[in-house]
Amino acid sequence: MALDQTAEIQMETAKTKETIPFWLAVSITVMFILPLGLYFGQYSLPLWVAFIVWAEYFALGANLGTIKTIIPAYTAGAFWGVCMILLYTWLATFMTGASVYPMYIALFVGVSVMVYVMKYFKVFQTGSLAYFNGLSMLLAVYFVGAHPTFTTNAYVLVLLSGAYALAGGYLGWFIGWFNVTITFPRPIAPKPAASTRV
């Protein structure tokens, strides 16, 4: 004998709809931050650093909670980079010959320690993208010279590189959040799935 069975009503996963299209929000965000990299001379921020961390924001979830991963991991990576370049600068003061040897030593020691400590900090594991980007952005800012150069003190220049790498990274997280926020997402009420009869 056939029995009527009504399928259980299932609710759709809650979704949101953008008020401002995402593509337009991206363009608005770019226009918003361009002055920071164009109009301040040697004090202009390296916006390419910000763009990379902006991408990290979306890669790691595109929500406010990413601040708990990106900021500490990126900061730690940049910190290790500063330590490596400071060590390189110090070694270069008394190691004669090719200047590449102090760099080899500093990077070998620094990267070894940087990777080793990852096992003790979960945020460095879940945020490994930001962790290593912190290092790479610090090295890029330093070697490209994308920082103020109002002094010739080699150690101060390393610290300035660190400050600008961090500023660019923090700006990147902010514009990721800003980009999503200005779409003004609206929640869409979940709808029950259509019932079926067998």
Residue ranges, per PLM feature:
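Short, Lys/Arg-rich, polar N-terminal cytosolic tail immediately upstream
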Residues: 1-17, 193-195
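Hydrophobic alpha-helical transmembrane segments in multi-pass integral membrane proteins
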Residues: 82-92, 139-154
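Membrane-helix interfacial "entry" motifs
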Residues: 14-19, 58-70, 95, 99, ...
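Structural signature of hydrophobic alpha-helical transmembrane segments
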Residues: 35-50, 96-108
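Short, highly charged, low-complexity non-transmembrane loops/tails of multi-pass membrane proteins
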Residues: 7-8, 182-198
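Pore- and pathway-forming membrane helices of multi-pass small-molecule/ion transporters and channels
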Residues: 27, 43-62, 108-114, 119-150
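Hydrophobic, lipid-facing residues on alpha-helical transmembrane segments of integral membrane proteins
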Residues: 20, 24-36, 68-87, 105-117, ...
